[in-house]
Swiss-Prot record:
Its EC number is 3.5.1.110. CDD domains: cysteine_hydrolases. One of its GO terms (biological process) is nitrogen utilization. Belongs to the isochorismatase family. RutB subfamily. This is Ureidoacrylate amidohydrolase RutB. Keywords: Hydrolase. It is an enzyme of class 3 (hydrolase). The active site is at D35 (proton acceptor), K144, C177 (nucleophile). GO terms for molecular function: hydrolase activity, acting on carbon-nitrogen (but not peptide) bonds, in linear amides.
Amino acid sequence: MSSPITPLSPGCVMLPARPEPVPVDPKTTAVIVIDMQNAYASPGGYLDLAGFDISGAAKVIHEIKGVLEVARSAGMQVIYFQNGWDDQYVEAGGPGSPNWWKSNALKTMRAKPELQGKLLARGQWDYELVDELKPQPGDIQLHKTRYSGFFNSQLDSVLRARGIRHLVFVGIATNVCVESTLRDGFFLEYFGTVLEDATHQAGPEFVQKAALFNIESFFGWVSTTADFKGTFGQLAPRT
């Protein structure tokens, strides 16, 4: 059985989670919204065109919307990530980059040349956030060019400047960009918690379970939207 986690600040409240409850202070916590773009959550977006099942995306959008309302009211910083590249795909890397070979978006465009310039390119519909989850005043938007939100981005400096130590993750895909960003945060001494029903995998259902197992066993904690809203929704709104 795990030992109780020592709160990092006096403002912490205990968030029910696996493998044990985790102390979270809203003032030092950010909700990280991973890649809730048309590419990953809308019919006709990259994941859909690449043959992945996105049927769970609508529920994830609904769950994230409720989480963000509570998070903002509790005084948490909300940070949105958008994954993609410039419209010439210079940022994606050429054949000398493993990203060029492993990115399913790039592979899909090579297989279907008519899609070239449309998938995950800034300025295109595919890159844009879904309409239901547009940022609000005070939210932060960041761009990333690889699976991890910490790679070549401003995320670490943005968090440190605000004294943020705990990251709550929502978004798509659990087994790719969510897990990659949480793992890199772990290596930089950030506490990471994923809300399992506010995420969705790219691939079969077993990869969702595997990603959550990895997170709760080795890199962070797993909670639910109900527990998050139940814990922080009762706090007095912060201005």
